[in-house]
UniProtKB/Swiss-Prot annotation:
Protein name (Swiss-Prot/TrEMBL): Phosphatidylethanolamine N-methyltransferase A
Class in the EC hierarchy, top level: transferase
Binding site for S-adenosyl-L-methionine: G107, F108, G109, E189, E190
InterPro entries: PEMT/MFAP, Phopholipid_MeTrfase
Catalytic activity annotation: a 1,2-diacyl-sn-glycero-3-phospho-N-methylethanolamine + S-adenosyl-L-methionine = a 1,2-diacyl-sn-glycero-3-phospho-N,N-dimethylethanolamine + S-adenosyl-L-homocysteine + H(+); a 1,2-diacyl-sn-glycero-3-phospho-N,N-dimethylethanolamine + S-adenosyl-L-methionine = a 1,2-diacyl-sn-glycero-3-phosphocholine + S-adenosyl-L-homocysteine + H(+); a 1,2-diacyl-sn-glycero-3-phosphoethanolamine + S-adenosyl-L-methionine = a 1,2-diacyl-sn-glycero-3-phospho-N-methylethanolamine + S-adenosyl-L-homocysteine + H(+)
Keyword set, alphabetical order: Endoplasmic reticulum, Lipid biosynthesis, Lipid metabolism, Membrane, Methyltransferase, Mitochondrion, Phospholipid biosynthesis, Phospholipid metabolism, S-adenosyl-L-methionine, Transferase, Transmembrane, Transmembrane helix
UniProt xrefs under PROSITE patterns: SAM_PEMT_PEM2
The protein's role, per its UniProt record: Catalyzes the three sequential steps of the methylation pathway of phosphatidylcholine biosynthesis, the SAM-dependent methylation of phosphatidylethanolamine (PE) to phosphatidylmonomethylethanolamine (PMME), PMME to phosphatidyldimethylethanolamine (PDME), and PDME to phosphatidylcholine (PC).
Pfam family, one: PEMT
Gene: pemtA
Length: 213
């Protein structure tokens, strides 16, 4: 009975989502494309150093990638906002509690993203390890002592907050798409990052061993 009611309510909510609207579809495309592109590009850089060669140094290569990722993020956020404007308004979200929740998510999500960026810096945030710019030690301070992947989690919170402030069920659907895509991206990013650091540690151990002979 509970499951049936839940399914019926989801069906009811979906009446407030225009799945054929252009900006809605473009937002999904951009959300999927962005991490797919930066993971492929970063792995190509790790294997071929093509951005390092083009830019003259690994730092400049990382800054270029950071600029491109940031620019794609702005495009994604703009498409998201444009999509919400064109979607039906869900009047049940026109409540004080929902407004307060959106403010809380804006605040906490923004703090997570900003604090993570300040801890990691440009190269730590934008895949500097793929360029050979490795962190000397694991970052353990706030917000990394609160949760794993605070930047991704904070970003999802900001999307949800924006959806609630626009009283948009479609915005929540898009936020869920962002969450799922980030989870998939992390599967590839975390495993390859571990590979980068384990390879670097093994190479360092070999050098130390050869020096001691």
């Amino acid at each position: 009975m509970i499951v049936e009611h839940a399914i019926d309510y989801i069906d009811y909510l979906m009446n407030y989502v225009d799945f054929t609207e252009k900006y809605f579809l473009l937002t999904i495309a951009c959300v999927v494309f962005n991490p797919t592109w930066w993971n492929i590009t970063a792995r190509m850089e790790y294997k071929t150093k093509f951005m390092t060669k083009i830019c003259g140094s690994k730092e400049n290569g990382c800054y270029l990638l950071a600029f491109l990722i940031f620019s794609l993020g702005i495009l994604r956020d703009w498409l998201f906002s444009e999509a919400l404007i064109r979607q039906p308004i869900f009047q049940e979200f026109d409540r004080f509690e929902v407004e307060v929740l959106s403010y809380i998510l804006y605040g906490f999500g923004g703090i997570l993203v900003l604090a993570a960026y300040l801890k990691l810096g440009i190269t730590g945030t934008y895949l500097g390890d793929y360029f050979g710019i490795l962190m000397k030690e694991r970052v353990t301070g706030f917000p990394f002592n609160v949760m794993n992947n605070p930047m991704y989690n904070g970003s999802v919170m900001l999307f949800i907050a924006h959806a609630l402030s626009y009283k948009s069920v479609a915005g929540l659907v898009l936020s869920f798409v962002v969450y799922v895509v980030y989870k998939f991206a992390l599967i590839f990013e975390e495993s390859f990052t571990n590979y980068i650091y384990s390879t670097a540690a093994a190479n360092a151990a070999k050098k130390n061993k050869s020096k001691s002979k």
